[in-house]
């Protein structure tokens, strides 16, 4: 009996250790209203970005009558919808990328060390929660924070590491990273 309890305690400890601590960022909070027979009912909608700052990020929307409840719902949804993104040297993207959602378009570029996060509003929150330190991004089209975050996430989902590209093409990573002979001759 004691041995069984001991195992359970170890399992509980392990699950607590394995659960990474997530950072979250409130991107937008809107007061919304619903017109009913007796007048207007007010509520709140929250948009939250959650990440472990080591390559995982997610976003969520939550609606409730009170702000803290809306934020809690959005945070829970964001944790359920997390994606993993391959980062180069744990600080930037592997390649330039474009993401789209609705009328929103986002262009993201890998940057050299020391550049910092050059991005506006909601995109900056996504990059910070993801753990990216150097990136240049530009939002074109819709400036709606929901569309900007979805477009950013679309671009990040398309991001692939040299290992993933090599695996897809059936080649070695060294072949993918090697410069073609024509470029070497010009330089």
Swiss-Prot record:
<protein>
    <recommendedName>
        <fullName>Small ribosomal subunit protein uS5</fullName>
    </recommendedName>
</protein>
<keyword id="KW-0694">RNA-binding</keyword>
<keyword id="KW-0687">Ribonucleoprotein</keyword>
<dbReference type="Pfam" id="PF00333">
    <property type="entry name" value="Ribosomal_S5"/>
</dbReference>
<dbReference type="InterPro" id="IPR013810">
    <property type="entry name" value="Ribosomal_uS5_N"/>
</dbReference>
<feature type="region of interest" description="Disordered">
    <location>
        <begin position="1"/>
        <end position="20"/>
    </location>
</feature>
<comment type="function">
    <text>Located at the back of the 30S subunit body where it stabilizes the conformation of the head with respect to the body.</text>
</comment>
<keyword id="KW-0689">Ribosomal protein</keyword>
<keyword id="KW-0699">rRNA-binding</keyword>
<dbReference type="Pfam" id="PF03719">
    <property type="entry name" value="Ribosomal_S5_C"/>
</dbReference>
<comment type="similarity">
    <text>Belongs to the universal ribosomal protein uS5 family.</text>
</comment>
<feature type="domain" description="S5 DRBM">
    <location>
        <begin position="22"/>
        <end position="85"/>
    </location>
</feature>
<comment type="function">
    <text>With S4 and S12 plays an important role in translational accuracy.</text>
</comment>
<dbReference type="InterPro" id="IPR000851">
    <property type="entry name" value="Ribosomal_uS5"/>
</dbReference>
<dbReference type="GO" id="GO:0006412">
    <property type="term" value="P:translation"/>
</dbReference>
<dbReference type="GO" id="GO:0003735">
    <property type="term" value="F:structural constituent of ribosome"/>
</dbReference>
<dbReference type="InterPro" id="IPR014721">
    <property type="entry name" value="Ribsml_uS5_D2-typ_fold_subgr"/>
</dbReference>
<dbReference type="InterPro" id="IPR005712">
    <property type="entry name" value="Ribosomal_uS5_bac-type"/>
</dbReference>
<dbReference type="InterPro" id="IPR020568">
    <property type="entry name" value="Ribosomal_Su5_D2-typ_SF"/>
</dbReference>
<dbReference type="InterPro" id="IPR005324">
    <property type="entry name" value="Ribosomal_uS5_C"/>
</dbReference>
<dbReference type="InterPro" id="IPR018192">
    <property type="entry name" value="Ribosomal_uS5_N_CS"/>
</dbReference>
<comment type="subunit">
    <text>Part of the 30S ribosomal subunit. Contacts proteins S4 and S8.</text>
</comment>
<dbReference type="GO" id="GO:0015935">
    <property type="term" value="C:small ribosomal subunit"/>
</dbReference>
<dbReference type="GO" id="GO:0019843">
    <property type="term" value="F:rRNA binding"/>
</dbReference>
